[in-house]
Amino acid sequence: MKFFAKMTATCLGLGFFPLAPGTLTSAFVVLLYKFFLFRLSWPFYLLIFVFLFLLGTYASTIYSKSQKKEDPRSAVIDEAAGQLLALFLINPTWILCTSSFVLFRFFDIVKPFPIKQVEDFPKGFGIMLDDVVAALFAGILLNLYLLLK
């Protein structure tokens, strides 16, 4: 079970990349979206997100306990789920995918209120939820821009 949690939490090892593993994972999700995932119906896309969130919460709880850290740097399933949500219903052009990526990474790294506070939720739920809130910030901001331009 620990091996499954480790592979899930680290997105099959992407989390072990020495430089910016969260950014690498987000970039990988952008490429998956750009070339494949945008074709999914929105209910199925959201179902995948919910499944990834629940699986990530479970795996992150086990993995963080095994690493004896609250939020191990190598646990990047939260970035995968967050980036997936930030891309929801976005037209898969390079400019919009890149904008979603930059906004999500900004909010995930800077963690303005209330994102930082959400991290304090227990175990894997806190690991996952701050990225979901960062994704909501990114998605809302990008969609507001698109509505107002």
At which residue positions do the language-model features occur?
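Alpha-helical transmembrane segments and their cytosolic membrane-interface
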Residues: 14-21, 42-45, 143
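Hydrophobic alpha-helical transmembrane segments
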Residues: 24-28, 43-50, 94, 98-102, ...
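Short alpha-helix boundary/capping motifs
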Residues: 36, 91-92, 113, 146
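Membrane interface segments of multi-pass transport proteins and intramembrane proteases
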Residues: 36-50, 114-125
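Alpha-helical transmembrane segments and their juxtamembrane interface "caps"
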Residues: 38, 42-56, 61, 73-77, ...
